[in-house]
Regions:
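Short secondary-structure junctions
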Residues: 18-23, 57-60
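Phosphate-interacting basic helix/loop segments used at nucleotide- and nucleic-acid interfaces
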Residues: 6-19
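Short glycine-rich, basic-tinged beta-strand/loop micro-motifs
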Residues: 24-36
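Cys/His-rich Zn2+-binding cysteine-cluster or related metal-binding knuckle/ribbon modules and their
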Residues: 3, 35-73
């Protein structure tokens, strides 16, 4: 399941950028996933939940992941 590694990389980029901007905690993450990425939204949600539970100092208790899925045309 490459979604776990993918979500880890995405969150590392977000956290790095947030640190530069002085943002301390996340309440929502929005992600656009294309059909050709072969990333499964349900697996990304599961990975997000795991990272959220492992990093309570970064994510609020009610932090959520919103995925917009784009079909290939």
């Amino acid at each position: 399941m490459h979604e776990m590694a993918l979500m880890g990389d995405i969150l590392n980029i977000i956290i790095e950028d947030a640190n530069k901007k002085g943002i301390k905690q996340f309440h929502q993450v929005e992600l656009m996933v294309g059909e050709l990425s072969n990333a499964m939204p349900d697996a990304l949600r599961m990975a997000f939940t795991i990272y959220k539970e492992q990093n309570p100092h970064i994510f609020s208790e009610d932090a959520s992941l919103h995925i917009q899925y784009e079909e290939a045309i």
